[in-house]
A protein has these predicted regions:
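Solvent-exposed interaction patches of small proteins and small membrane subunits
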Residues: 1-122
């Protein structure tokens, strides 16, 4: 698969999963999210999809969007591998409250300012 098409697809996966995370967590406070087993697991699954997609992006593409917290997403990717515990809870909530909204904001900005990064062309 062409690298440009793959990158566009990965960005699309990250964006859609981010929207899903925000929809799932909408109107939930931290304790509600962490108590809701089904919602919590689906949020975790979507966050893993985002982190995996972002991790697979070529370094050149990452450099084109320096505002995205790449190291934060890598850290989250590692944290999501934990089975349970306070560190996982903190990582989930931080991703819902901070990482995901910031990612979606920057993707929207870059889609406008650098549309070629999001073009599905070979």
């Amino acid at each position: 698969m062409n690298q440009r098409i793959a990158a566009t697809a990965l960005l699309g996966v990250a964006e859609q999963a981010g929207l899903d995370v925000l929809t799932l967590a909408e109107n939930l406070d931290r304790d509600e999210l962490l108590r809701s087993r089904l919602t919590r697991e689906e949020v975790r699954r979507q966050l893993r999809a985002i982190a995996d997609a972002l991790s697979a992006l070529h370094p050149e593409l990452r450099r084109a969007m320096p505002e995205i917290d790449w190291s934060g997403w890598e850290h989250l990717r590692s944290a999501l591998a934990a089975t349970a515990g306070d560190a996982l809870d903190e990582a989930l909530w931080f991703a819902v409250e901070s990482l995901t909204p910031a990612l979606l904001l920057w993707l929207r900005i870059h889609r406008r300012s650098q549309p070629e990064l999001f073009a599905m062309r070979g």
